[in-house]
């Protein structure tokens, strides 16, 4: 899969049997400090889950997910409110709904099993978002979360969440 966001995240996305493999590896397996963007190992590779998570390093040179924290500003969100996820089988438009800082052990990284858990995830995301999207989210909407390290406190993460819609 490759992901493109306002020409910011034009990168291929890997997936492994765990969430460690691509932290410091390129898609071909060679060591690299920046690693590779990668999908959570628990997700279906075809993005068919209700909640798909993609991780990437917050690189100071704005590569990988280094520019994700720019979504802490309303103005940046307004100029970049839509992303595109392009995969070999299906392309998706992602309407962003929330961006916020959360601990690495946050419930956003758990896969909700009940409607109540999903509602709680969405409420937390929207209540903590550093921008206002004004977008209504339904229980049937599939979500994409992009996650990167953040430095407000130990083990902080910046997450950017959006609604995943098939296109084309």
Stretch-by-stretch model annotation:
Residues 1-5, 9:
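Single conserved hydrophobic/aromatic residue that forms the stacking wall/gate
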Residues 14-168:
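Extracytoplasmic/periplasmic soluble domains downstream of a signal peptide or transmembrane helix
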């Amino acid at each position: 899969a490759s992901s493109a966001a306002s020409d910011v995240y034009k990168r291929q996305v890997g997936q492994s049997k765990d969430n460690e493999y691509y932290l410091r590896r390129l898609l071909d397996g060679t060591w690299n400090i920046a690693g590779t963007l990668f999908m959570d190992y628990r997700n279906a590779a075809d993005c068919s889950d209700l909640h798909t998570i993609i991780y990437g390093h917050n690189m100071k040179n704005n590569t990988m997910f280094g520019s994700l924290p720019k979504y802490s500003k309303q103005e940046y969100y307004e100029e970049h409110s839509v992303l595109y996820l392009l995969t070999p089988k299906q392309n998706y438009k992602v309407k962003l709904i929330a961006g916020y800082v959360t601990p690495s052990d946050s419930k956003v990284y758990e896969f909700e099993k009940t409607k109540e858990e999903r509602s709680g995830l969405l409420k937390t995301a929207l209540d903590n978002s550093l921008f206002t999207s004004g977008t209504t989210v339904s229980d049937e909407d599939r979500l994409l979360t992009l996650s990167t390290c953040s430095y407000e406190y130990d083990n902080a993460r910046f997450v950017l969440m959006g609604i995943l819609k098939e296109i084309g």
